[in-house]
Amino acid sequence: MQDAITSVINSADVQGKYLDGSAMDKLKAYFTTGALRVRAASTISANAAAIVKEAVAKSLLYSDVTRPGGNMYTTRRYAACIRDLDYYLRYATYAMLAGDPSILDERVLNGLKETYNSLGVPVGSTVQAIQAMKEVTAGLVGADAGREMGVYFDYICSGLS
């Protein structure tokens, strides 16, 4: 896992250079939004279960996947879906705090699409639920923090598509 600081420094180090104006601007932006990211993470942490519950209600609860024969039918499959959404929310929050999506590749996306396809998990429904979670989260944390979190939700959706 990297963060925005490590990413900027590693890039300069690989090139054997000091940090240039562009690198300094990236660091400045990261530090400027630090308090916003910490407040958003605190709000998300305190409301994680409610965020997931509302996202499921908005996107999956009354769709074909929850009816008999659907991929979320049976309590066990439904619970696994809820667990996965909570997992995506948690790791998107970590990535937002770090200002870098690398943790999403390392801990969430590597091999996930293939696993879902082999298990018959409907990726489209999963992406729909993540987009609903993005909307619910933005409503809770505000527009600026919601846009920042949205970057990482979109990153997960892109990795699954």
Curated annotation (Swiss-Prot):
Contains one covalently linked phycocyanobilin chromophore. The chromophore is added by the phycocyanobilin lyase CpcUS. (2R,3E)-phycocyanobilin binds at residue 81. InterPro entries: Allophycocyanin_b (IPR006245), Globin-like_sf (IPR009050), Phycobilisome_asu/bsu (IPR012128), Phycobilisome_asu/bsu_sf (IPR038719). Keywords: Antenna complex, Bile pigment, Chromophore, Electron transport, Membrane, Methylation, Photosynthesis, Phycobilisome, Thylakoid, Transport. Pfam families: Phycobilisome. Its main location: membrane. GO terms for cellular component: phycobilisome; plasma membrane-derived thylakoid membrane. The modification N4-methylasparagine is found at residue 71. It is found in: Cellular thylakoid membrane. One of its GO terms (biological process) is photosynthesis. It is a peripheral membrane protein. Light-harvesting photosynthetic bile pigment-protein from the phycobiliprotein complex. Allophycocyanin has a maximum absorption at approximately 650 nanometers. Heterodimer of an alpha and a beta chain. Belongs to the phycobiliprotein family. This is Allophycocyanin beta subunit. It comes from Picosynechococcus sp. (strain ATCC 27264 / PCC 7002 / PR-6). The gene is apcB.
